[in-house]
């Protein structure tokens, strides 16, 4: 029976926000008849309580219930009344400003602790999260909607970590727990809003703790405040530059505030960051007992990352004597690792932290950060790449501007000057997003396959480059080698056979026989079953595992999850909306029409087809493959395969882009589409990218990608047809065995 079961005062789940109370568990606990099942006990925060203690840092803190101090609550109420209530009547939260004026009085109140019932409202105001929520162009609901379609590496990793984040808490213990879908939405929304960060396990721990005490939307905006304001940039990025820098700053502060401990760490050559990096990355979430965490976070949301240093120094100071008396390095390391779990007195810890490092200022920390960041980048410069340093000053948020409603535009029009500015800004952003997506793909190739490191990533904008595009396209066939990739292992039994392992690249010498080809691998020549390999169409580039989505999964996410959305945004820029409600409006429809129109134009002239036959290469069927016809055939191929699977136009567009990358003609296809002037004018506004000279710049940017060899599956997003795939391979092998009289092989084995 569903109902609104309420926890008892100071009982299990009583400290949580009401919307996350696990009603099933509360219902069971209220029915004492079911005494046959062993009862699982939970504390007021929803953590399992047993003899060993399932929660991090279980200590004497777990034995005392969380009870608000009435005088403390009165002091807070008096402060808020005095500073905010200028009207006669009761003070309510909607009358309190979105941010609290900073003062010494407010700091002393925060240091003494915030009443638990007031934390959700005060945390939002102290951190600046409420201000962000009010000022945001997009609502949390809209961000969640935008992020729900992102199938990227981040989304996959989030799914893997959902049940690992807080398994000992009833709200996140299993798939059906009430907090799991909330955590999923918050983390996916953050990954969408901060594409350079994506997902980091540290954000998952912090978000899960926030969801225990705040509503989902408020927890999201709190995370935004943490990422953008409370912590330095790149704290949660893939490089972890921000948090690594803070570990070096911490070592500097230990030299200053705890010289005896510094000497001990140097003597035993102990790398403190192996322990403390996790403390900083999670802002102590899952590191200390939840009650101590609440007190630390009260200060953290008011003063920012300075509190992380002060708290860590306070912990180390309290255990300094024990560390100095340790006998060996292992003992010191274990003692350091156990420090957070042994912290059971919030007043003692925070008092020690403020007494020791209360004079520490943001200016001092920031000065050290700049210095150590420079050292860190110098040390890791080769692996970080040149673009990393430019993004450390701030966290880059995805542009989130709400579009005017159609009715508003019709009734009141648009501010022409402002609209023009917005369009210019939007164009710049679109090019920047595409450029970043291309660079991410390029860096993937260079990191995965070193032979790509010499590729020039700076686009060539010269006029001559466009003429060379078609010359290079024609020249591809002249340097073309026929090679194939092994689909499975083939063991060599006779001298005339060619053995290979799955994913080996074989040079094809002869394809005269339908079933058995002759090839060369590592200096050896021999025959092999044709069905055991897949012919590579490498154009003028050598095959690279970095571009093969059957070998390297990451390239799929970079292309379909990053590059394709950036290209789609360009094609959507200035796309005319349908005049009738319900009319379709998608770049795919424009591409279909433009590709068909360009091919029809060539079909009108027999002479032009004869010229094209001499100019461009022919495929194995003798068909002319100009860039225009290659585009047309690719569109038709995608339609045939994807319509059968009822795929959406977004999927079709992504698959077409993958084909263009495989053929190394994506930039030429853009030129074909933009040169179809009647179609472009029909589908696009005059200020759109595709009707402006700006498309030439996009073509130059895309040309960089033709330097890399892609082997992407056109049907990657379609349901797999396993039965149909397996049968032809076996039949082909049977034919080959019959032909060569190799009946001694057990083909069913």
UniProtKB/Swiss-Prot annotation:
Keywords annotated in UniProt: Cell cycle, Coiled coil, Cytoplasm, Growth arrest, Phosphoprotein, SH3 domain
Listed GO MF terms: GTPase activator activity; small GTPase binding
Regions that span the bilayer: none
Span of domain SH3: 479-538
Listed InterPro entries: Rab-GAP-TBC_dom (IPR000195), Rab-GAP_TBC_sf (IPR035969), Rab_GAP_TBC_domain (IPR050302), Run_dom (IPR004012), Run_dom_sf (IPR037213), SGSM3_SH3 (IPR035833), SH3-like_dom_sf (IPR036028), SH3_domain (IPR001452)
Domain RUN positions: 554-717
Residues of the Rab-GAP TBC domain: 113-304
Tissues showing expression: Expressed in brain, liver, kidney and testis. Moderately expressed in heart, very weakly in lung and muscle. Not expressed in spleen.
Sections of the chain in a coiled coil: 414-438
Main localization (coarse): cytoplasm
Record carries keyword Transmembrane: no
Record PTM Phosphoserine, positions in chain: 405
Subcellular location: Cytoplasm
Pfam families recorded: RabGAP-TBC, RUN, SH3_1
Gene3D superfamilies: 1.20.58.900, putative rabgap domain of human tbc1 domain family member 14 like domains (1.10.8.270), SH3 Domains (2.30.30.40), Ypt/Rab-GAP domain of gyp1p, domain 3 (1.10.472.80)
Record-level GO BP terms: plasma membrane to endosome transport; positive regulation of protein catabolic process; Rap protein signal transduction; regulation of cell cycle; regulation of Rab protein signal transduction
Gene Ontology cellular component annotations, sorted alphabetically: cytosol; gap junction
Membership in a protein family: Belongs to the small G protein signaling modulator family.
Function description: May play a cooperative role in NF2-mediated growth suppression of cells. May act as a modulator of small G protein RAB- and RAP-mediated neuronal signal transduction and vesicular transportation pathways.
Subunit-level organization: Interacts with GJA1. Interaction with GJA1 induces its degradation. Interacts (via RUN domain) with NF2 (via C-terminus). Interacts with RAB3A, RAB4A, RAB5A, RAB8A, RAB11A, RAP1A, RAP1B, RAP2A, RAP2B and PDCD6I. No interaction with RAB27A. No interaction with GJB1 or GJD2.
Protein name (Swiss-Prot/TrEMBL): Small G protein signaling modulator 3
Source species of the chain: Rattus norvegicus (Rat)
């Amino acid at each position: 029976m569903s109902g609104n079961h309420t926890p008892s005062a100071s009982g299990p789940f009583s400290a949580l926000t009401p919307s996350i109370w696990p009603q099933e568990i509360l219902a069971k606990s209220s029915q004492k008849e079911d005494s046959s099942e062993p009862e699982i006990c939970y504390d007021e925060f929803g953590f399992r309580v047993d003899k060993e203690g399932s929660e991090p840092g279980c200590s004497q803190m777990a034995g005392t219930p969380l009870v608000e101090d009435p005088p403390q609550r009165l002091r807070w109420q008096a402060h808020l009344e005095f500073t905010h209530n200028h009207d006669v009547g009761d003070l309510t939260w909607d009358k309190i400003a979105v941010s609290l004026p900073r003062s010494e009085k407010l700091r002393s109140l925060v240091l003494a602790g915030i009443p638990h019932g007031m934390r959700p409202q005060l945390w939002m105001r102290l951190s600046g999260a409420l201000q962000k929520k009010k000022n945001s162009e997009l609502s949390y609901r809209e961000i969640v909607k935008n992020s729900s379609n992102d199938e990227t590496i981040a989304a996959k990793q989030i799914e893997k970590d959902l049940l690992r984040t807080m398994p000992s808490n009833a709200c996140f213990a299993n798939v059906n727990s009430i907090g799991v879908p909330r955590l999923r939405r918050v983390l996916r929304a953050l990954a969408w809003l901060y594409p350079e960060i994506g997902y980091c396990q540290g954000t998952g721990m912090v978000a899960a703790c926030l969801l225990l005490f705040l509503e989902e939307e408020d927890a999201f905006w709190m995370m935004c405040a943490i990422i953008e304001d409370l912590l330095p940039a790149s704290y949660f990025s893939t490089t972890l530059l921000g948090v690594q820098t803070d570990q070096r700053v911490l070592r500097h502060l230990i030299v200053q505030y705890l010289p005896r401990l510094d000497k001990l760490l140097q003597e035993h050559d102990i790398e403190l960051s192996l322990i403390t990096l996790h403390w900083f990355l999670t802002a102590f979430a899952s590191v200390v007992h939840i009650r101590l965490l609440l007190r630390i976070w009260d200060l953290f949301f008011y003063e920012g990352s300075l509190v992380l240093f002060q708290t860590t120094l306070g912990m180390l100071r309290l255990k300094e004597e024990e560390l100095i008396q340790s006998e060996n390095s292992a003992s010191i390391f274990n003692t350091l690792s156990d420090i957070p779990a042994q912290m059971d007195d919030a007043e003692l810890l925070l008092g020690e932290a403020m007494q020791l490092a209360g004079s520490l200022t943001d200016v001092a920390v920031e000065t050290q950060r700049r210095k150590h960041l420079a050292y860190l980048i110098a040390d890791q410069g080769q692996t970080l790449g040149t673009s990393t340093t430019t993004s450390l000053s701030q966290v880059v948020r995805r542009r989130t501007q709400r579009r005017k409603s159609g009715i508003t535009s019709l009734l009141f029009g648009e501010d022409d000057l402002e609209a023009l500015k917005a369009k210019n800004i939007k164009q710049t952003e679109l090019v920047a997003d595409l450029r970043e997506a291309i660079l991410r793909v390029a860096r993937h190739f260079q990191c995965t396959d070193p032979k790509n490191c010499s590729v020039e990533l700076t686009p060539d904008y010269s006029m001559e480059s466009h003429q060379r595009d078609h010359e290079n396209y024609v020249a591809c066939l002249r340097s073309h080698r026929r090679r194939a990739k092994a689909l499975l292992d083939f063991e060599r039994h006779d001298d005339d056979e060619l053995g290979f392992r799955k994913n080996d690249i074989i040079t094809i010498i002869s394809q005269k026989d339908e079933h058995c080809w002759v090839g060369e691998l590592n200096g050896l020549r021999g025959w092999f079953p044709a069905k055991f390999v897949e012919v590579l169409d490498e154009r003028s580039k050598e095959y690279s595992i970095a571009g093969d989505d059957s070998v390297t999964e990451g390239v799929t996410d970079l292309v379909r999850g990053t590059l394709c959305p950036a290209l789609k945004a360009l094609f959507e820029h200035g796309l005319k909306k349908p005049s009738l409600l319900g009319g379709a409006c998608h770049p795919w429809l424009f591409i279909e029409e433009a590709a068909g129109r360009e091919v029809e134009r060539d079909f009108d002239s027999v002479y032009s087809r004869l010229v094209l036959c001499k100019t461009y290469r022919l495929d194995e069927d003798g068909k002319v493959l100009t860039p225009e016809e290659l585009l047309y055939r690719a569109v038709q191929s995608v339609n045939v395969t994807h319509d059968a699977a009822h795929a959406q136009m977004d999927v079709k567009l992504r698959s077409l882009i993958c084909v263009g990358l495989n053929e190394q003609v994506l930039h030429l296809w853009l030129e074909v589409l933009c040169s179809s002037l009647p179609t472009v004018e029909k589908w696009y506004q005059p200020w759109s990218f595709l009707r402006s000279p700006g498309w030439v710049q996009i073509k130059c940017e895309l040309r960089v990608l033709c330097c890399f060899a892609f082997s992407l599956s056109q049907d990657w997003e379609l349901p797999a047809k396993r039965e149909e795939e397996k049968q032809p391979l076996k039949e082909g092998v049977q034919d080959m065995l019959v032909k060569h009289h190799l009946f001694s092989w057990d083909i069913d084995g």
